[in-house]
A protein has these predicted regions:
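Short, amphipathic alpha-helical "recognition" segments used to contact nucleic acids or chromatin
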Residues: 6-23, 73-82
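Mobile-element integrase/transposase regions
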Residues: 67, 71, 101-102, 106, ...
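Basic, flexible linker segments flanking DNA-binding modules
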Residues: 51-144, 222, 292-302
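Charged alpha-helix within mobile-element recombinases
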Residues: 224-305, 346, 350-351
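Acidic/histidine-rich, metal-coordinating catalytic segments
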Residues: 195-218, 239-241, 246, 292-293
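Short, Lys/Arg-enriched anionic-surface-contact patches
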Residues: 1-14, 62-70
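C-terminal, beta-rich DNA-binding module of retroviral/retroelements integrases
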Residues: 276, 280-389
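Mobile genetic element proteins and their domesticated derivatives, centered on retroelements
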Residues: 15, 28-29, 39-42, 50, ...
């Protein structure tokens, strides 16, 4: 006798009344298609509470320990409205810091969904992650700085294309600057200020665009990146047309697009400065244990001492690169790169009569005196002079 074919309330009353008289309780339960446990429950409820209590009881608990108060819900909604593009985990950390304890991450998600404060994202197809030429990843502050220009947009002040510089390990945003242009001199002045304030990094990660690189030059060196090499900074570059090689930096640019570019403001640099302060001092990051970048970043121990007049190649011959990109060796003019104009390079003789050509720690290639030619190194990999000696 399936339960669903008859009125549930009448069926329970009928069963309970018959259960008071039957001698074979289990057979009666089989007749009604229920377990003895359910049968005893309905019989006992009739005896203890009367026939009217045989109706279905709510399965909802009388108390819900995890239920949020109205005040907690309002706090969560206020946080989400203030930080419209932050996820539940970041908002939970901000809440905990402000109030000592915080509801669960799932509670944050539930409140935001019910308040209509969650935008559904289109699922992206998984992409094949690629390795860059030098796959070094930072393990301490200032081990690697990542840099790029945020894609431009137009505002009331004209074209805006901010330069962004970030410490890769701590996520600390060192600079987001709306420069007048992207010329080498302008960007170099900006980096001189950064080096003076934060010291020098061990390496700088960039894409292959101007002014960070020059696709047609020796090892992709531009005047700007040659200056970095002269300061003892290694160059890390992503593959052409592979922005995922600097993925963390690109994600930060998307945040700028949503939270600055897409909002009204009177002064672009003031708006960028406010966003930078929030990013560093208010926004927790999962990769650093939900801490703020300002809590884990510290300036570099390598202090900025200005640009050297010339580079020291102890024990090696040295030649200065002319404005045309040539060096003079044994009365022969040999072309290297105009990006090295004004710098001196080191020459180390080899047993076969050729010479290794170094720029700071970077092996550029081989000079062949007999043919007055130069063969550049195919891979841009820094090599210590002492290892080559």
């Amino acid at each position: 006798m399936p339960w669903q074919h008859r009125d549930l309330m009448n069926q329970r009353m009928e069963f309970a009344l018959r259960a008071l008289e039957t001698e074979n309780f289990r057979a009666l339960c089989r007749e009604y298609g229920i377990s003895p446990r359910v049968g005893y429950k309905w019989r006992d409820r009739l005896l203890e509470e009367g026939m009217w209590r045989l109706s279905e009881k709510s399965r909802r608990p009388k108390t819900t320990p995890g239920a949020l108060s109205e005040e907690e819900v309002c706090r969560i909604v206020a946080l989400r409205v203030r930080h419209q593009h932050w996820g539940a985990r970041k908002l939970q950390e901000i809440y905990r810091r402000a109030h000592g304890e915080a509801p669960s991450e799932s509670s944050f998600k539930r409140v935001m969904e019910r308040a209509g404060l969650v935008e559904k994202r289109r699922r992206r197809k998984a992409s094949q992650g690629g390795k860059i030429g030098d796959d070094r990843r930072a393990g301490t502050p200032n081990e690697v700085w990542s840099i790029d220009f945020k894609g431009w947009w137009h505002d009331a002040q004209g074209r805006c294309e901010p330069l962004t510089v970030r410490d890769e390990w701590s996520r600390y945003l060192l600079e987001v600057r709306a420069l007048e242009n992207a010329r080498m001199e302008t960007v170099r002045t900006c980096f001189e200020r950064l080096f003076e304030r934060y010291g020098l990094p061990q390496a700088i990660r960039s894409d292959n665009g101007v002014p960070f690189s020059s696709s047609r030059a020796l090892l992709g060196l531009s005047k700007l990146s040659a200056w970095w090499v002269a300061l003892g900074i290694d160059l890390l570059r992503g593959r052409p047309a592979h922005p995922q090689d600097n993925g963390g930096h690109e994600r930060m640019h998307k945040d700028i697009a949503r939270e600055v570019e897409g909002t009204p403001y009177m002064d672009r640099q003031a708006a960028l400065d406010v966003w930078k302060k929030e990013f560093n001092e208010e926004r927790p990051h999962e990769a650093i244990g939900m801490k703020m970048p300002s809590e884990v970043y510290s300036p570099s121990a390598r202090k900025w001492q200005g640009t050297p007049d010339q580079l020291d190649y102890e024990g090696l011959m040295s030649r200065r690169v002319k404005g045309t990109g040539y060096i003079c060796f044994e009365s022969q003019q040999i072309f290297l790169s105009t990006a090295l104009h004004g710098w001196n390079v080191g020459l180390k003789p080899l047993d076969d009569g050729s010479l290794e050509v170094y720029f700071a720690k970077l092996l550029l290639g081989h000079l062949h005196p007999e043919t007055a030619s130069f063969t550049p190194l195919l891979q841009n990999s820094p090599q210590e002079l002492e290892e080559a000696a």
